[in-house]
C-alpha cells in the first residue's frame, strides 16, 4: 500500500497537468487513473468536483475546437503549476485510498487519534482547571443536599473508630488551595523580582536539588488531622442546627435555607476523594430515581389507566406532586375521564404520600432535590467533557509505551486498551499545581496498567503480581550471571546473589515455566503438532496391542487341536474369550459331571498342550517382557 501511493500520486499529477494544459479531461481519462478498488459513487463524485474546482472541465467525450473557443477561448494557454498539481494529486490520492483504509480497526484508531492536536503545558492546565471546575460544581451541589453531609459525618465517625483511613474521607482543603492560587497569581502579576549575584549563585547551586524537592512535594502528605477534626466538628454543629431549624419551620423557611447554606459553606471547603464523591453522587441519584419512580406511576395511572390527556395532566400536575387534593381538584372539572380517575384516586394518593415521605427523609422539597440533581449533572458533564479531551490528546503516549511491551502474551490492541485505562486513571488523579507535565505523570500510570494486565492475563495459569516481579528479577540476574561466567547459574549461586533461600529459588524457577500448547506446530512443514509426540499412558502401546492380538490367535489355534469338550473346559477354567474364569464346581454343573471329573479333563488337556508340537507355538510369547 505504501509503495502504491507514490505511483498513484505521480499518475494523478500527470492527469492534472494534462487537464490544466488542454483545459478539459474526459471521464474515461479520470477513470483510468483511479484505483481499481474505488467503487463508491460518492467518492468518485467528490473527485470530479475537486477536479472541476481546479478549473478543469470533465466531459463524456473530448469537445471539439469550437466548443473550447466558446469556453473562455483559452485553450492551450493555461500555465501548469507543478506545486498545485502535486498538492492536488496528494489530496486526490488521500481521498482515493480513504475507503481502502477503513476496514482495519488499528488503522482506523490511529487515523482518528491523529486528528487530535497535542496539548501544550498551558493547554493541559486549562483542561485540568475545567475538570476541577466541574468537580467543584458537583461538590457544591452535594453540599446543599443534607444527606451528603450525613454520610460524610458517618464516614468520619468510622475513621475515628479505626474502620477507615482519613485519606478515604478528606484529601485536602479547597479554600487553602484557592488562597495559594491567589497568592501565586499576585506574585506572577508583580513581575520578576530582582536578585543579587550571590542569590543567583545560590539558585544555580540548588538546581541539582530541584528534582528531589519536586519529588518531596509530589509525595502525598495528606491533610492536617487536627484541622480536619476542627472542620468536621463545625460541620456536625451546623448539621445539627439545620435539622433543629427544619423540624421547627419546614423545608422552605428562610431560616432553613440559611442554615443549609451555612452547612454547605463548610462542606465545600473539604476536598473529597473521588470514590467518596462517587458514593455521594450515587446516593443523590438514587433519591432522584425514587422521586421519578413515584411520578412515573402517577403518570401511568392518570394517562394510561384513567385516559386523562397527557397535556392536561402535565399542566395540572406541575407543582402539585405532594398536593393530596390534586385528584379532587381534577375531578371537579367533570371531564369524560373523571370516572376512571376516581377509580385510581387511592393509588395516586398513595404515590403522592410516598413523595411526601421522601421530602421529609431528605429535608428538601421535590423541586429543590431536582434542582440540586440538575446542578450536579451539569458539573459532571463539564468534568466528563474536559477529561475526554485530555484523554484523546494523550492517546499517542499510550501507543509509544505499549510498543515496548509487545510479544509478552497480550495482543497489541489489548495493551493499548489497558494503557488507556491507566491514562484515564491518570487524568482523574492529575494535579496541575505540582508543576510537572501531564505526560510525566501519566507515563507511570500507563506503564503500571500495562504491566499489571500482562501479569494477570498473559499466562494461562495466573501468577500473583509479586511473584511475577520475583521471576523477572530472577531472569534478569540469570542473564547477568550467564554473561559474566559464560554458563547458566546454579540455584545455589542465584540464592546467594538474590539473598533468598535456595528452596525458594527452586520454587520460583519451577513456577516460572510457562505452559505450552499441545497444538504447537513441529517441523519446517508444520504438518505435525507437539501433542503427537507425547505418550498417552492411558492407551495401550501398539507393540503390546499387537502382541496380545497374536497371542489370542495362537491360543485359539492351539485349542482347536483339542477335543471340543477339552477346549471348552480350558476356556471356562482360564476365562479365555470370556468375562471371567470359572471354578471346577461351576464347570461341572455346566457339563453335569462332578468337579473331580472336570479336574481330570483339565489335567489331560494341559498334558496335550505341553507336547512340543503345541507348546512351541506359545513358548515364543514367554520371551517377550
UniProtKB/Swiss-Prot annotation:
Positions of the DNA-binding region: 584-603
Question: Which superkingdom is the protein from?
Answer: Bacteria
* Acidic residues compositional bias, start-end: 196-218
- Main subcellular location: cytoplasm
Q: Which residues form the signal peptide?
A: none
Please give the residue ranges the record annotates as the region Disordered: 194-226
Database matches in InterPro entries? RNA_pol_sigma-70_dom (IPR014284), RNA_pol_sigma70 (IPR000943), RNA_pol_sigma70_r1_2 (IPR009042), RNA_pol_sigma70_r2 (IPR007627), RNA_pol_sigma70_r3 (IPR007624), RNA_pol_sigma70_r4 (IPR007630), RNA_pol_sigma_70_non-ess (IPR007631), RNA_pol_sigma_70_r1_1 (IPR007127)
GO cellular component term, pick one: cytoplasm
Q: According to the UniProt record, where is the region Sigma-70 factor domain-4? A: 558-611
Please provide the record's keywords in A-Z order: Cytoplasm, DNA-binding, Sigma factor, Transcription, Transcription regulation
Compartments (UniProt record): Cytoplasm
Subunit (UniProt) = Interacts transiently with the RNA polymerase catalytic core.
Role, per record: Sigma factors are initiation factors that promote the attachment of RNA polymerase to specific initiation sites and are then released. This sigma factor is the primary sigma factor during exponential growth.
Q: Which family does it belong to?
A: Belongs to the sigma-70 factor family. RpoD/SigA subfamily.
Name by which UniProt lists this protein: RNA polymerase sigma factor RpoD
Gene coding for it: rpoD
Amino acid at each position: 500500500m505504501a509503495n502504491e501511493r507514490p505511483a498513484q500520486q505521480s499518475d494523478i499529477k500527470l492527469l492534472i497537468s494534462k487537464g490544466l494544459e488542454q483545459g478539459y479531461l474526459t471521464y474515461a481519462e479520470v477513470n483510468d487513473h483511479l484505483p481499481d478498488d474505488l467503487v463508491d459513487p460518492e467518492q468518485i463524485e467528490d473527485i470530479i468536483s475537486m477536479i472541476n474546482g481546479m478549473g478543469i472541465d470533465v466531459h463524456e467525450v473530448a469537445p471539439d475546437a469550437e466548443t473550447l473557443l466558446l469556453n473562455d477561448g483559452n485553450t492551450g494557454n493555461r500555465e501548469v503549476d507543478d506545486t498545485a498539481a502535486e498538492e492536488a494529486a496528494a489530496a486526490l490520492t488521500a481521498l482515493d485510498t480513504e475507503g481502502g483504509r477503513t476496514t482495519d480497526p488499528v488503522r482506523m484508531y490511529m487515523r482518528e487519534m491523529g486528528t487530535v492536536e497535542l496539548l501544550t503545558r498551558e493547554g493541559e492546565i486549562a483542561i485540568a482547571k475545567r475538570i476541577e471546575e466541574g468537580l467543584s460544581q458537583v461538590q457544591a451541589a452535594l453540599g446543599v443536599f443534607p444527606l451528603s453531609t450525613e454520610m460524610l459525618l458517618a464516614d468520619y465517625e468510622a475513621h475515628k473508630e479505626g474502620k477507615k483511613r482519613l485519606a478515604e474521607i478528606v484529601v485536602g482543603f479547597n479554600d487553602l488551595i484557592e488562597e495559594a492560587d491567589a497568592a501565586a497569581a499576585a506574585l506572577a502579576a508583580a513581575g520578576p523580582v530582582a536578585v543579587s549575584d550571590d542569590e543567583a549563585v545560590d539558585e544555580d547551586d540548588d538546581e541539582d536539588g530541584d528534582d528531589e524537592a519536586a519529588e518531596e512535594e509530589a509525595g502525598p502528605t495528606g491533610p492536617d488531622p487536627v484541622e480536619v477534626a476542627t472542620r468536621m466538628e463545625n460541620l456536625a454543629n451546623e448539621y445539627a442546627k439545620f435539622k433543629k431549624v427544619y423540624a421547627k419551620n419546614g423545608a422552605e423557611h428562610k431560616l432553613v435555607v440559611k442554615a443549609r447554606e451555612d452547612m454547605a459553606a463548610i462542606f465545600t471547603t473539604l476536598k473529597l476523594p473521588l470514590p467518596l464523591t462517587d458514593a455521594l453522587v450515587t446516593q443523590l441519584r438514587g433519591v432522584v430515581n425514587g422521586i421519578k419512580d413515584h411520578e412515573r406511576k402517577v403518570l401511568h395511572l392518570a394517562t394510561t389507566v384513567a385516559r386523562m390527556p397527557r397535556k392536561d395532566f402535565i399542566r395540572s400536575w406541575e407543582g402539585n406532586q405532594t398536593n393530596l387534593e390534586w385528584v379532587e381538584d381534577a375531578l371537579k372539572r367533570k371531564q369524560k375521564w373523571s370516572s376512571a380517575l376516581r377509580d385510581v384516586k387511592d393509588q395516586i394518593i398513595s404515590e403522592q404520600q410516598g413523595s411526601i415521605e421522601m421530602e421529609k427523609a431528605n429535608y428538601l422539597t421535590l423541586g429543590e432535590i431536582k434542582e440540586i440533581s440538575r446542578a450536579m449533572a451539569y458539573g459532571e458533564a463539564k468534568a466528563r467533557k474536559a477529561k475526554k479531551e485530555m484523554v484523546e490528546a494523550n492517546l499517542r503516549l499510550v501507543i509509544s509505551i505499549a510498543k515496548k511491551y509487545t510479544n509478552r502474551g497480550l495482543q497489541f490492541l489489548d495493551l493499548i486498551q489497558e494503557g488507556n485505562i491507566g491514562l484515564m486513571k491518570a487524568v482523574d488523579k492529575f494535579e496541575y499545581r505540582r508543576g510537572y507535565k501531564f505526560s510525566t505523570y501519566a507515563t507511570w500510570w500507563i506503564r503500571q496498567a500495562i504491566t499489571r494486565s500482562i501479569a494477570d492475563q498473559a499466562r494461562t495459569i495466573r501468577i500473583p503480581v509479586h511473584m511475577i516481579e520475583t521471576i523477572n528479577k530472577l531472569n534478569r540476574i540469570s542473564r547477568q550471571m550467564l554473561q559474566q561466567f559464560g554458563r547458566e547459574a546454579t540455584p545455589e549461586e542465584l540464592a546467594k546473589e538474590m539473598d533468598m533461600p535456595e528452596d525458594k529459588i527452586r520454587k520460583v524457577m519451577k513456577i516460572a515455566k510457562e505452559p505450552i500448547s499441545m497444538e504447537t506446530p513441529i517441523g519446517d512443514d508444520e504438518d505435525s503438532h507437539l501433542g503427537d509426540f507425547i505418550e498417552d499412558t492411558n492407551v495401550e502401546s501398539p507393540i503390546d496391542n499387537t502382541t496380545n492380538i497374536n497371542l489370542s490367535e495362537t491360543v485359539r489355534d492351539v485349542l482347536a487341536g483339542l477335543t471340543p469338550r477339552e477346549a471348552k473346559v480350558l476356556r471356562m477354567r482360564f476365562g479365555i474369550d470370556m468375562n471371567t474364569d470359572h471354578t471346577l464346581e461351576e464347570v461341572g454343573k455346566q457339563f453335569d459331571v462332578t468337579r473331580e471329573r472336570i479336574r481330570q479333563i483339565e489335567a489331560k488337556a494341559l498334558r496335550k498342550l505341553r507336547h512340543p508340537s503345541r507348546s512351541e507355538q506359545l513358548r515364543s510369547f514367554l520371551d517377550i517382557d
